[in-house]
């Protein structure tokens, strides 16, 4: 546990203003014909929202970078199936709790989806793009839930008042999907739109579950003691990827169970895992002792993009990385001295959206950025 202490302190600094549920989901790209060309190709989608922003010269995979948000705290932005909109969580500049909004990439128009009360997290479009799923605490109280007790060190709150809700993309027809004791959040949908995956404490630990889109046929697919979260499906729906922390027996396990009983977890290290969609054939992808989170499949289904502080000895700087599903071929994607996280590819594989502290309006300000994705920067440069 001691070897993770510097990273924990850094994690609290970098992410204190961002709800770190890190759903890491989204409607996946077409598995049969992913766009992996050397240079960005023309697309029917026109991004008129936001303002151009210069990428670091070392960020060769990213071109035509645009900053989409500018005030408040903005993160966990995920594409609609047609790639024209995002759904994300935002804390207004004037304060309050995170709420869920949609964002039109052509115009920048935003629409509140959640109730404006309680705290929300982890939003995701239904396949047809007219409904959104998210987690919210508003049924228990319209007030923001109490922040976690930091006297115990840096901890995350897994509020038992979080349940899954569905609403139209304009906030209408709000429907509660789960109503079980404990935390239900971090839901994403399969590319086929037939099942969803989420994290729940309904059986006493933070495990992954799948269920039909109407809330029926719930299946628990992980059972190892520890935190399993932020899962999503591969492009063909056959695999899942998630981040997890499995405490070792002894004091670390005792601390985990004690905090869990208080609705808290201590995010020491987080590693990335993959498995079949039913939870079988689990394989560990990263093994570096750092905080690795927000994994999302590359359009090919053969690589994973994720955020990590592995290259900063102080643990303060998080960047995006690409890695093969077997753990080989690690490549760094972003190079800023600030936080970069929550990456997601667009359904056609041509764009990457993520959250970043670059160009902040105030210290630690997190905003949403989008860029065209270049699969092979060296080849594109020679064109």
Where are these regions (language model features)?
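Hydrophobic beta-strand positions that form the internal "hydrophobic ladder"
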Residues: 86-87, 132, 196, 240, ...
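Blade-level signature of beta-propeller repeat domains, shared across WD40, Kelch, NHL, RCC1
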Residues: 344-383
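C-terminal motif of bacterial Sec signal peptides marking the signal peptidase cleavage site
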Residues: 20-22
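A flexible loop/linker signature enriched in serine peptidases of the S9 family
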Residues: 70-72, 90-100, 115-120, 135-163, ...
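Bacterial signal peptide processing site
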Residues: 24-26
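Residue-level detector of Asp-centered blade-edge/turn motifs that repeat once per structural unit
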Residues: 81-82, 127-128, 191-192, 235-236, ...
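Blade/loop signatures of beta-propeller domains
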Residues: 41-63, 162
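Multi-bladed beta-propeller domains
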Residues: 53-73, 103-119, 167-183, 213-227, ...
């Amino acid at each position: 546990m001691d070897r993770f202490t510097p990273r924990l302190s850094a994690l609290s600094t970098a992410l204190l203003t961002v709800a770190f549920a890190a759903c890491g989901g989204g409607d996946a790209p077409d598995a049969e014909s992913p766009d992996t060309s050397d240079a960005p190709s023309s697309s029917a989608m026109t991004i008129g929202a936001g303002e151009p922003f210069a990428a670091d010269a070392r960020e060769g995979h990213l071109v035509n970078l645009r900053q989409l948000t500018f005030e408040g705290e903005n993160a966990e932005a995920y594409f609609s199936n047609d790639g024209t909109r995002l759904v994300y969580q935002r804390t207004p500049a004037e304060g309050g709790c995170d709420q869920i909004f949609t964002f039109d990439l052509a115009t920048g128009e935003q629409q509140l989806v959640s109730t404006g009360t309680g705290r929300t997290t982890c939003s995701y479009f239904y396949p047809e793009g007219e409904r959104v799923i998210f987690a919210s605490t508003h049924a228990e109280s319209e007030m923001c839930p109490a922040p976690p007790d930091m006297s115990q060190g840096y901890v995350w709150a897994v509020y038992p008042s979080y349940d899954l809700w569905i609403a139209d993309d304009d906030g209408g027809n709000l429907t509660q999907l789960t109503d079980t004791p404990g935390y239900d959040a971090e839901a994403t949908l399969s590319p086929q739109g037939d099942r969803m995956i989420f994290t729940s404490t309904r059986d006493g630990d933070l495990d992954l579950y799948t269920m039909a889109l109407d809330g029926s046929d719930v299946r628990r697919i992980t059972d190892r003691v520890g935190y399993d979260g932020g899962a999503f499906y591969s492009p063909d729906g056959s695999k899942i990827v998630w981040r997890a922390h499995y405490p070792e027996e002894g004091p670390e396990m005792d601390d985990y169970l004690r905090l869990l009983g208080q609705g808290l977890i201590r995010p020491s290290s987080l590693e990335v895992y993959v498995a079949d969609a039913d939870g079988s054939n689990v394989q560990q992808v990263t093994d570096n002792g750092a905080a690795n989170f927000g994994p999302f499949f590359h359009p090919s289904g053969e690589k994973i993009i994720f955020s990590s502080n592995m290259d900063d000895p102080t643990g303060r700087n998080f960047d995006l990385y690409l890695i093969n599903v077997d753990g080989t071929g690690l490549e760094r994607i972003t190079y800023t001295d600030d936080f970069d996280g929550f990456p997601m590819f667009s359904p056609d594989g041509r764009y990457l959206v993520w959250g970043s502290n670059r160009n902040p309006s105030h210290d630690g300000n997190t905003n949403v950025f989008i860029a065209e994705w270049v699969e092979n920067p060296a080849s594109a440069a020679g064109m």
